[in-house]
Amino acid sequence: MNCVKINPCCLKGDIKIPPSKSLGHRAIICAALSEEESTIENISYSKDIKATCIGMSKLGALIIEDAKDNSTLKIKKQKLVSKEKVYIDCSESGSTVRFLIPISLIEERNVVFDGQGKLSYRPLDSYFNIFDEKEIAYSHPEGKVLPLQIKGRLKAGMFNLPGNISSQFISGLMFSLPFLEGDSIINITTNLESVGYVDMTIDMLKKFGIEIENKAYKSFFIKGNQKCKGTKYKVEGDFSQAAFWLSAGILNGNINCKDLNISSLQGDKVILDILKKMGGAIDEKSFSSKKSHTHGIVIDASQCPDLVPILSVVAALSEGTTKIVNAARLRIKESDRLKAMATELNKLGAEVVELEDGLLIEGKEKLKGGEVESWNDHRIAMALGIAALRCEESVTINGSECVSKSYPQFWSDLKQLGGDVHEWSLGE
């Protein structure tokens, strides 16, 4: 286990935002479904992205790093598909397992999906219901969903999904249904949450020549027998990661974020609007933020659940009360993120009450500091690291290595901006 100790400090400077993990997954998958070669630039090798690359390779993709630039990949689908049983380790990546399950069923296959940590317990019921309806054989251990063995082939038709589940299930079907022999419809039975992630999937597929007809987010018509074309695509910066630095600037600094796209479809771009509503000094042209006096607001997290950990930190250091609502899905992420943030922020001296679907936070000028746990969750660790900037004493975070899931260089970037960061390992 690794630990970091962060002393209170002011951050200043420019930071190159890592490539979007969400867009990286989608670009790699689309390229791997095309028999024409694609070039995907600006890939960051987080654990989650590596899991998707390895998984798509197991399903028949040829993925080669550019000899001159290892952040560039050459990808295409190989025509021959192995009939042997395929084993795919998804590590702790929910995107990988939920995207690749339907993809593995485009052709007749026998596949075992496995994973680590909390991933073995994150729900897959939406797919199990489809398997039962479409007569696809599957099995998994009692009490958990992985390892999951699947045997069969997906058939085109009607697919009913509720809108209040992870959008990863909807995206997973969108990656597979265009390649089936008949037309399909995804019918959304309740109000769709995380719309931005669905938009990103549809847009990425379109870049590779696949058309999906969006009928006001109530249903999606998907014509069968489509083919992906090869293309060249550069992954833009990740707003969910930029959120940590924009928040850091507002709490105690002056930070400019580089490599972001103001026209991005990323749902987490809403961080700009939320921080401004809280009184944060945000320049949307330069993607910069500086120390500001912020105040509490009501935050509806239904469309931006990944922002809740860092927004709860900003709320804990803002005048007045902040209420975060519609965030129940955070209880089944890498950790129970509502419980994790309430528990760890309170250790630092914050006033956070855990609600059934959110958090109630009474802000303070400063927190005390102390020792906290990462819950083996990258977003919890990074949020607590930013909280340390406005504490009276140092903050020690146990299990800090978990940031490798999405942002391996987070602690070094914190140092680069002037953070007083000390890292050490306690061994296994």
UniProtKB/Swiss-Prot annotation:
It is found in: Cytoplasm. Its EC number is 2.5.1.19. The keyword Iron-sulfur does not apply. Pathway: Metabolic intermediate biosynthesis; chorismate biosynthesis; chorismate from D-erythrose 4-phosphate and phosphoenolpyruvate: step 6/7. GO terms for molecular function: 3-phosphoshikimate 1-carboxyvinyltransferase activity. GO terms for biological process: amino acid biosynthetic process; aromatic amino acid family biosynthetic process; chorismate biosynthetic process. GO terms for cellular component: cytoplasm. PROSITE patterns: EPSP_SYNTHASE_2. InterPro entries: Enolpyruvate_Tfrase_dom, Enolpyruvate_Tfrase_sf, EPSP_synthase, EPSP_synthase_CS, RNA3'P_cycl/enolpyr_Trfase_a/b. Phosphoenolpyruvate binds at residues 21, 94, 122, 168, 337, 379, 405. It comes from the Bacteria. It catalyses: 3-phosphoshikimate + phosphoenolpyruvate = 5-O-(1-carboxyvinyl)-3-phosphoshikimate + phosphate. Catalyzes the transfer of the enolpyruvyl moiety of phosphoenolpyruvate (PEP) to the 5-hydroxyl of shikimate-3-phosphate (S3P) to produce enolpyruvyl shikimate-3-phosphate and inorganic phosphate. PANTHER family: AROM/DEHYDROQUINATE SYNTHASE (PTHR21090), PENTAFUNCTIONAL AROM POLYPEPTIDE (PTHR21090:SF5). Belongs to the EPSP synthase family. Monomer. This is 3-phosphoshikimate 1-carboxyvinyltransferase. It comes from Clostridium acetobutylicum (strain ATCC 824 / DSM 792 / JCM 1419 / IAM 19013 / LMG 5710 / NBRC 13948 / NRRL B-527 / VKM B-1787 / 2291 / W). The gene is aroA.
